[in-house]
Design a protein with these regions (language model features):
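Terminal-region recognition feature
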Residues: 1-192
Length: 192
């Protein structure tokens, strides 16, 4: 069993002292982290944070992404929320932004998508599996193809690449360093 210790921060204020866990303190500065697998729990947390911050004011919100990817539907829920709020969303790739992590990195407000100089990005075709009767397998296969087309169109729009190039590049794992990710259009700048 891995025990994760979350640091706390003590701040002095007019009432004395306020204790925050590190993530809550950073949230005060409009900073959100997506780390690890993107799943329904991650999506609920990130969506709640985005909506909360947007309800306070419409200043920029920063999302740091270090994720191997995960659920397409959970990722699209985060994406849709990023698009409906009034605040600009700055995305910053740290470590590895792969699969849905790369998609979310590319989905920040244009001009406000960054990557650290030693971070990496990986895009690929969505993964899925099916079991059951032939009809059920066909339904799942059709759904996977539909989601692939949807994600590839969105990634093409985000990166200003052609759909043909995205379709070709996502057939296999396609890794990019920071410079390549910037040239590809996933991000706009490298933070050094």
């Amino acid at each position: 069993m891995i025990i994760l210790i979350i640091p706390t921060i003590v701040e002095k204020n007019y009432e004395g002292h306020q204790i925050y866990d590190i993530y809550s303190r950073l949230l005060k500065d409009r900073i959100i982290f997506i780390s690890g697998e993107i799943n329904d729990d991650t999506a609920s947390l990130v969506i709640s944070e985005l909506l909360y911050l947007d309800s306070i004011n419409h200043n920029d919100i920063s999302i740091y992404i270090n994720s191997p990817g995960g659920s397409v539907t959970a990722g699209l829920a985060i994406y849709d929320t990023m698009k409906i709020i009034k605040s600009d969303v700055e995305t910053i790739g740290v470590g590895m932004s792969a699969s849905m992590g790369a998609f979310l990195l590319s989905s920040g407000t244009k001009g406000k998508r960054s990557i650290l100089e030693n971070a990496e990005v990986m895009i690929h075709e969505i993964l899925g599996g099916a079991q059951g009767q032939a009809t059920e397998i066909q339904i799942q296969a059709d759904r996977i193809l539909h989601l692939r087309e949807k994600l590839n169109k969105l990634l093409a729009k985000n990166s200003n690449q052609t759909l043909k190039k995205i379709n070709n590049d996502t057939k296999r794992d396609h890794y990019m360093d920071a410079e390549e990710a910037m040239n590809y259009g996933i991000v706009d700048k490298i933070l050094k």
